[in-house]
Amino acid sequence: MPKVGMREIRRAQLIDATLRSIDEAGLPGTTLASVAQRANISTGIVSHYFGDKDGLLEATMRHVLRDLWAATTQRRVAARKDPRSRLRAIVAANFDDTQVSAPVMKTWLAFWSQSMHDAMLKRLQHVNTRRLHSNLCAEFAKALPRAKARQAASGLAALIDGLWLRGALAGGPIDTRAALKLAHDYIDLLLASD
């Protein structure tokens, strides 16, 4: 009989091993066997929990997305209630420590690439894109007319993605302070233009 709670412990262990494997070997070098080896368990156990490599990547990205959504919620709740503060909180969540470690950044890059070929991953990416746009639009709509709020949300989402992508591809630790300053300046510009 399995130990109570072992399933979640094992899944977390395997997701961590997947993040490390993608960090060290990339997605092509990440296999059920490489993940099992990093987790010190059998390949059969990885198969039991995730089925195949696609299932493992999907579960890993769901974990990363939950971390992003938790950081977004936590920062929005802690922010002052004005749109500027809440927009800054959303931006900061995208550059949260849970999103900018080397293993997570490389996993995001692998996920984006693979989502163009896998329907489930494409759906996850679509949900994430819509959620970001919706959150930004809701805050901009408190200060701007509806059409301008939508346009501002699209622009800020593109800026977040662009700053994050440039940081991920820079080859070293991401300069979150510089990224946040650029995004904050953009928010200030948009809110001042109304």
Swiss-Prot record:
<feature type="DNA-binding region" description="H-T-H motif">
    <location>
        <begin position="31"/>
        <end position="50"/>
    </location>
</feature>
<dbReference type="GO" id="GO:0000976">
    <property type="term" value="F:transcription cis-regulatory region binding"/>
</dbReference>
<feature type="domain" description="HTH tetR-type">
    <location>
        <begin position="8"/>
        <end position="68"/>
    </location>
</feature>
<dbReference type="InterPro" id="IPR036271">
    <property type="entry name" value="Tet_transcr_reg_TetR-rel_C_sf"/>
</dbReference>
<dbReference type="GO" id="GO:0003700">
    <property type="term" value="F:DNA-binding transcription factor activity"/>
</dbReference>
<dbReference type="GO" id="GO:0019285">
    <property type="term" value="P:glycine betaine biosynthetic process from choline"/>
</dbReference>
<dbReference type="Pfam" id="PF00440">
    <property type="entry name" value="TetR_N"/>
</dbReference>
<comment type="pathway">
    <text>Amine and polyamine biosynthesis; betaine biosynthesis via choline pathway [regulation].</text>
</comment>
<dbReference type="InterPro" id="IPR023772">
    <property type="entry name" value="DNA-bd_HTH_TetR-type_CS"/>
</dbReference>
<dbReference type="InterPro" id="IPR050109">
    <property type="entry name" value="HTH-type_TetR-like_transc_reg"/>
</dbReference>
<dbReference type="InterPro" id="IPR001647">
    <property type="entry name" value="HTH_TetR"/>
</dbReference>
<dbReference type="InterPro" id="IPR039538">
    <property type="entry name" value="BetI_C"/>
</dbReference>
<dbReference type="InterPro" id="IPR017757">
    <property type="entry name" value="Tscrpt_rep_BetI"/>
</dbReference>
<dbReference type="InterPro" id="IPR009057">
    <property type="entry name" value="Homeodomain-like_sf"/>
</dbReference>
<protein>
    <recommendedName>
        <fullName>HTH-type transcriptional regulator BetI</fullName>
    </recommendedName>
</protein>
<keyword id="KW-0804">Transcription</keyword>
<keyword id="KW-0678">Repressor</keyword>
<keyword id="KW-0805">Transcription regulation</keyword>
<keyword id="KW-0238">DNA-binding</keyword>
<comment type="function">
    <text>Repressor involved in the biosynthesis of the osmoprotectant glycine betaine. It represses transcription of the choline transporter BetT and the genes of BetAB involved in the synthesis of glycine betaine.</text>
</comment>
<dbReference type="Pfam" id="PF13977">
    <property type="entry name" value="TetR_C_6"/>
</dbReference>
<dbReference type="GO" id="GO:0045892">
    <property type="term" value="P:negative regulation of DNA-templated transcription"/>
</dbReference>
